[in-house]
A protein has these predicted regions:
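Helix-to-loop junctions at the C-terminal end of transmembrane segments
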Residues: 64-77, 276-290, 377
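C-terminal ends and interior cores of transmembrane alpha-helices
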Residues: 86-103, 300-315
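Hydrophobic core of transmembrane alpha-helices in multi-pass small-molecule transporters
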Residues: 23, 105-123, 319-334
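Juxtamembrane intracellular "pre-TM" segments in multi-pass secondary transporters
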Residues: 1-12, 195-232
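A late C-terminal transmembrane helix in Major Facilitator Superfamily
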Residues: 349-378
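Helix-loop boundary and gating motifs at the non-cytosolic
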Residues: 5-59, 226-233, 237-256, 262-266
Length: 415
């Protein structure tokens, strides 16, 4: 049973509403991320344009992330969620429209991909911050799990669509329909449904103390022993996310595996993630002190995933490549726990600024690696995956340098 709006232990119905929106956002995001390379190749557009677009997008994020973080800490996360979700769907539609009419698509793709990254960041960061500030502290992990489970549902739907729509009908049709659905659901979610519960959460968000810029910086500086290793670990993890998201399916094609098989195993992965996420709400309630363990386990599964991909390429073993995706399924539980731990240490009032600093650092790494990874993939996919595996291993090792207890915040995770 759903809890009422002011429950200290349950999930506000508006979070369930946001979960529905997140399903369609994840559907559009997955269609774009896993389909853009194939979409470009099908329309005789060089994949390198995507690499240039990714790099430009990360550079733009460097300039906007701190400003967005300050806006979040000033209480504008709801407005940013609305803006990010609607504009993301609009730009996805423009990509379809531009490519379909053949109007200088190569140049416009370079412009559109950065916009997709920026609006994705606007929505995701604002959504996570809104939950952190507006949800009851004792139910924070449960709320995050609900949001991330909906993300898994959206991704699973996207893989079904990609298998039975993109290849049976048209990838263009998938792009345009998912973009229109996203904009429609966003308008419903934010302006027409669950208005009472929405207002309760917005009031809860506005009640969180709003520190000034200097105070936010001082707060983060006092947590540098936590923030520096965590952000560094995430930066190396991001290299793997970029590679897996954009090049897992094309790598399967390189190995002679049809996209339908790759998408089917990705679908199975996210179906497992949905089950784990549903069970994870109870796990997070019972193990709120596990803290750093969630971070380390999450990075460990990345190492396993990318290691299996590397082995599959070296030894040309198809089933290793397909099975590798399945090890991403515990991510819903582990990321929910890690995010709850993060908020407990950093504090709700500084969540936006921490996210901004984090995106700055990660953006630098992403800007440097996006185009090189794309270029290396076009030359030899095995080299690219070797780099990704090494980065994931470094990320995993760094997690053990994160302190395990923070008495000043009350967050005392267990190793």
């Amino acid at each position: 049973m759903e809890a009422n709006g002011n429950s200290e232990t349950g999930i506000n119905p508006f979070v369930s509403n946001l979960s529905i929106l997140n399903i369609f956002f994840s559907l559009s995001l997955t269609v774009f991320s896993f389909g853009i390379v194939i979409y470009l190749e099908n329309n005789a557009i060089s994949v390198l344009y995507a690499g240039v677009g990714l790099t430009l997008g990360q550079i733009i994020l460097l300039g906007t992330s701190i400003l967005q973080g300050r806006a979040i800490d000033k209480g504008y996360s709801f407005q940013l969620m609305v803006t990010g979700s609607i504009l993301y769907g609009a730009v996805l539609f423009l990509i379809y429209f531009t490519v379909s009419i053949g109007y200088i698509p190569s140049l416009l793709i370079i412009a559109f991909i950065p916009l997709m990254l920026v609006f994705e960041g606007v929505f995701r960061s604002s959504l996570n911050a809104f939950i952190a500030k507006a949800a009851a502290a004792r139910a924070l992990g449960k709320n995050y799990s609900r949001i991330l489970t909906s993300e898994a549902i959206g991704s699973a739907l996207a893989y079904v669509v990609m298998v039975y729509g993109a290849f049976s009908l048209s990838l263009s049709l998938v792009f345009v329909s998912s973009s229109i659905l996203l904009v429609f659901i966003a308008l419903l979610s934010f302006f027409f449904l669950r208005s009472r519960e929405r207002d309760i959460m917005r009031k809860a968000e506005s009640s969180v103390r709003r520190p000034g810029f200097r105070e936010s910086i001082r707060n983060l500086s006092s947590k540098k022993n936590f923030a520096i290793p965590l952000i560094t670990s995430k930066a190396f993890m991001t290299i793997g996310i970029i590679g897996f998201t954009f090049f897992y399916v094309p790598t399967g094609v390189y190995l002679g595996i049809s996209p339908e098989y790759s998408f089917t195993f990705l679908l199975i992965t996210y179906l497992l993630a949905i089950l784990i996420g549903k069970y994870g709400e109870k796990v997070l309630d019972r193990h709120q002190g596990f803290g750093r363990g969630f971070v380390s386990l999450n990075m460990m599964f990345d190492v396993i995933t990318y290691g299996l991909v590397v082995l599959s390429i070296i030894y040309r073993v198809d089933y290793l490549f397909l099975i590798a995706a399945l090890f991403a399924s515990p991510g819903v539980l582990l990321v929910s726990g890690a995010m709850t731990y993060e908020v407990g240490v950093i504090g709700r009032e500084s969540r936006g600024m921490f996210g901004g600093v984090q995106r700055q650092f990660i953006g630098v790494i992403s800007a440097f690696v996006s185009f090189p990874l794309t270029y290396i993939f076009t030359r030899n996919p095995s080299y690219m995956w070797g780099i990704i595996f090494a980065a994931s291993l470094i990320s995993f090792i760094i997690t053990f340098t994160i302190p395990s207890a923070f008495p000043s915040t009350g967050a005392v995770p267990v190793n």
